[in-house]
Amino acid sequence: MTHFPWLSTIVLFPLLASLAIPWLPDRKGTTVRWYALGVGLIDFSLIAYMFGRYYDFEQTSLQFVEDITWIDRLHLHWSLGVDGLSMPLVLLTGFITTLATLAAWPVTKNPRLFYFLMLAMYTGQLGVFVVQDLLLFFLMWELELIPVYLLVSCWGGKKRLYAATKFILYTALGSIFILLGALTMPFMGIQGVTFDMSTLAYREYSLPVEILLYTGFLIAYGVKLPAIPVHTWLPDTHGEAHYSTCMLLAGILLKMGGYALIRINMNMLPHAHALFSPWLIGVGVVNIIYAALTSFAQRNLKRKIAYSSVSHMGFVLIGIGSLSEAGLNGAMLQMISHGLIGASLFFLAGTTYDRTRTLVLEEMGGLATFMPKTFALFTACSLASLALPGMSGFFAELLVFLGLVTSEAYSPTFRAIMTVFEAIGILLTPIYLLSMLRQLFYGRSIGRPKALIDAGPREVFVVSCLLVPILGIGIYPKLATAIYVNTTDHVVQHVLSALR
């Protein structure tokens, strides 16, 4: 049974299934909605079954490996595999995409194209996490680009074209560096041409070449993460995109940047990574503090949450740069945690907009009286975002914090300074999140509150599904860390051994 092509099936099924959408007999979009939800459920069920039945928690090498020669002259292989770095993100992708199809239920404008793009994006995102061929990685990275552009430009707000154009310009610029790196690394060295990422991880490069490759990849993945100063596309895109698209962006797309930094920059270019690591920590600290302060100043609800995402992804940069097992484990857990929390906050922001028809915080207020269920859900997700003990974010940030403090790669002075700034950023988080809750749900009611409708069964179900793993991981972190801890420890040891 393990010889079954699990990964090819999981990756290609959403895209192939989406091709049937134009021929579905449907006038109002109901059939299309149920069809897309069914595709998401089937694919996520396959992922869950593969993981539960066959995944080996102790193994650090690739599992479910598929390697088929695709284009021989180009040395291009259909090479797939998962390990501890990719398996939790594959699970996260399937889970959030399935919920996003349900979140998109109110979309009435051309639902056929909307769900077609969502499923195509699903394939691209899964592909990024499972492919093991560097050129194929680039192709999958690009596959999700066009669907996001169309989802934002066709179903966004008033400034959707500006936001979509800004998104594609930033990401296309980053993609150029990925392509250059993907066409350079395989042809260097005496071992022969190969795009296999596992082989390239042990290939020797001169330090100047490694630094150039690392810089290009860092720019590309920094855009996706996003890292300051290449982050400005994110607030605009989140501010204009439909909230179901925001769930996919915050929950999955940002994680592609963090994953690629670990898989390619850290694992394949260890010498350059050691040189850049202090800068990663510095940028991570800037992410946390600058984005937290900027979030506090935002008047738009979705932009406020978007800047909070930039702040939280700073912990991922610090964990990756810490050169410690605890730090990298924390970075992985932060990606999982933020994927769940970010998706829940954007979903709630969108459903609140559906009722109030505004995202300007000054035009809201006093909603707790009229929308108690929305208030309770928003409060729970906000507390999770500020890393309340018992929630997934707490243990993630704690691991990153400990990873930096205990790292032997840096001087005590550097660790102390960065730790102080990191702590300041942690203290800023509750300021902007609790301020957001106060502006939304407390104070004087504005507008016509009698017309407001509280969260319905669909909204409660979606947020509850996200809160269950947030609480589960917060109470028992090993639910998540057991999936990847052996692999992340192996990656850290690989980097440290390369430096000896």
Swiss-Prot record:
Has keyword Transmembrane helix? Answer: yes
Recorded superkingdom: Eukaryota
Q: Which UniProt keywords apply?
A: Chloroplast, Membrane, NAD, NADP, Plastid, Plastoquinone, Quinone, Thylakoid, Translocase, Transmembrane, Transmembrane helix
Q: Which GO terms describe its cellular component?
A: chloroplast thylakoid membrane
Q: Name one GO molecular function term.
A: ubiquinone binding
Q: Where are the transmembrane segments?
A: 4-24, 32-52, 87-107, 113-133, 134-154, 167-187, 211-231, 242-262, 274-294, 305-325, 330-350, 374-396, 417-437, 460-480
Q: What is its EC number?
A: 7.1.1.-
Catalysed reaction, written as an equation: a plastoquinone + NADH + (n+1) H(+)(in) = a plastoquinol + NAD(+) + n H(+)(out); a plastoquinone + NADPH + (n+1) H(+)(in) = a plastoquinol + NADP(+) + n H(+)(out)
NCBIfam families assigned: NDH_I_M, PRK12561.1
Its protein name is: NAD(P)H-quinone oxidoreductase chain 4, chloroplastic
Q: Which organism is it from?
A: Nephroselmis olivacea (Green alga)
Q: Which gene encodes it?
A: ndhD
